[in-house]
Design a protein with these regions (language model features):
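Bacterial N-terminal signal peptides
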Residues: 7-19
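Aromatic-lined carbohydrate-recognition surfaces of secreted/lumenal glycan-active proteins
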Residues: 158-176, 226
Length: 277
């Protein structure tokens, strides 16, 4: 995923060092917890290797950004059987698609129904948190807020919980507005879980497996329950000071050639509460 402003080599590379790997094995007990997400399903054959490192994974309900298909569908049982928790994701609309406040509200409601239908079909339990991927950052315009809140309300009515994946970085070209804070301040009493992106070094550690999953307080969004601190490919305009990405700009899972990932820290080993057992 990639936040745009208005928001995957060899088995072992400089991205992850061998010494960092054992220290970051999937945690038990208290958090925070390391997880990953990626637009393409990593394959059943890689799940056990990834689970030795990560507690949870992203799981798309519709086509991820820039993709014409979604190959995560149908793999929920395999992912849970491997021991993963979930970050359940639905790719939202860009501003150019919204046109007007009334149209944005209609799209938010219809997209929420699509997310709910797929979540149910995939077997996610009621009260699972579905994160809406808000790709564009900065201050949200009226049409964007109309879409977001219509989506959130419809998801909640259906018995699921709503989350939003959005920027946690101050937009210097937009009055230093932080998208997550802007959405929260206008949300009223809506119950929204926030997944904040801040891949700038610092505060992000970059593409590395730290001794412990980084504290979410470091993300700059105090109320975030998930922090994405590295993206593939590296965003040079934001994460240019991070020196530990692979030479091709991606962040690779150790020991799994070709599997590039985004890195996350969360307060729960199952941030969407998507497991059934």
């Amino acid at each position: 995923m990639r936040v745009v402003r208005c928001i995957v080599a060899l088995a072992f590379t400089a991205v992850f060092t061998f010494s960092a790997w054992p220290a970051a094995m999937a945690q038990a007990g208290t958090g925070p917890y390391l997880g990953f997400d990626r637009n393409e399903y990593p394959g059943d054959e890689n799940l056990q290797s990834l689970r030795r490192i990560f507690s949870y994974t992203g799981y798309w309900l519709n086509n991820p950004p820039g993709m014409k298909s979604n190959n995560w569908i149908g793999h929920r049982s395999a992912v849970e059987a491997a021991g993963f928790g979930f970050l359940v994701l639905f790719n939202g609309r860009l501003y150019a698609e919204l046109k007007s406040v009334s149209n944005a509200q209609r799209l938010g409601q219809s997209d929420a129904q699509a997310a709910i239908k797929t979540a149910q079909h995939e077997g996610f339990p009621r009260a699972s948190i579905i994160f809406l991927d808000q790709e564009q950052g900065g201050r949200m315009l009226p049409e964007q807020k109309a879409y977001l809140y219509a989506w959130v309300d419809a998801v909640a009515v259906a018995g699921f919980r709503a989350g939003i994946y959005c920027s946690g970085i101050a937009a210097k070209d937009d009055g230093n507005v932080v998208t997550a804070e802007d959405i929260r301040q206008s949300a009223g009493k809506r119950d929204i879980v926030y997944w904040a992106i801040n891949d700038a070094c610092p505060p992000a550690p970059g593409c590395t497996l730290p001794q412990h999953a980084p504290s979410l307080v470091q993300s700059g969004v105090s109320f975030a329950e998930v922090w994405q601190f590295a993206q593939s490919p590296q965003r040079k305009d934001v994460a240019g000071r991070c020196s530990n990405y692979n030479h091709d700009g991606n962040c690779y899972a150790p020991g799994i050639p070709g599997v590039y990932i985004d890195l996350n820290s969360a307060t729960s080993p199952d941030p969407s509460h998507g497991r059934t057992q």
